[in-house]
């Protein structure tokens, strides 16, 4: 199975992440409110490449000179505009920060489809766009993502050697392990069994074993040999959607391969904690800025 099938599966599984997270509201501006900001430029753009429509929102200082760039991917329920406050905050700290999400040209009725990119080449379009931006120093680019966007960022780091720093909040790192129903008690095991049946139907296979090549392709933990940028993983210690063990194993694998990885655990936090708890969000964001400054501002 190739990278394209892995991205298709990754997008499909995000449906179940949404189900697992539940209906509790998220506040994307909780720590990052949009306020008038003199000296900050905003740009927005919608452009097509192949069968993908990219929605792009970016902020940067209104001054001359190249800036380190950060590409930001939202969680499964978010769009680029939801992350404008984060982009604005990064711009105030001296970054060119762009948030993106994707649509399919064959079905523009869906604002933010689960399957936005059907190949890793499509998933790299926004990164290449950032790379070519006249305000961005192409030698200092990082990626940042939340949940689905964190997984996307890790996979980008595996296929784009120019990425200098990766920050992934509560990412799914190993789909095969996450979908192993033997670790779950009733009734949670029923939900994961149903999930497996849906995946088999989507992939048009009759046995679970036939899904494993795609699960492995979509899992960042199976690409650690290709991730050379320093990685910061931020995870809630009480995350019941994507357990912190996912990030623990990924970090261990990266370190075992001689790569730089740091795992920062917020002890009592759950999934998407930074859009629900301001105090937890602040601690995580301070760590994020410290990491990006260390690796992108040289």
Residue ranges with predicted function:
Residues 27-63:
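N-terminal cap/lid segment of alpha/beta-hydrolase-fold proteins
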Residues 113-134:
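Alpha/beta-hydrolase active-site loop
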Residues 136-146:
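Alpha/beta-hydrolase fold nucleophile elbow
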Residues 227, 233-235, 239:
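Short beta-strand/loop motif that positions the catalytic acidic residue
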Residues 240-246:
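Conserved alpha/beta-hydrolase "acid-adjacent" motif
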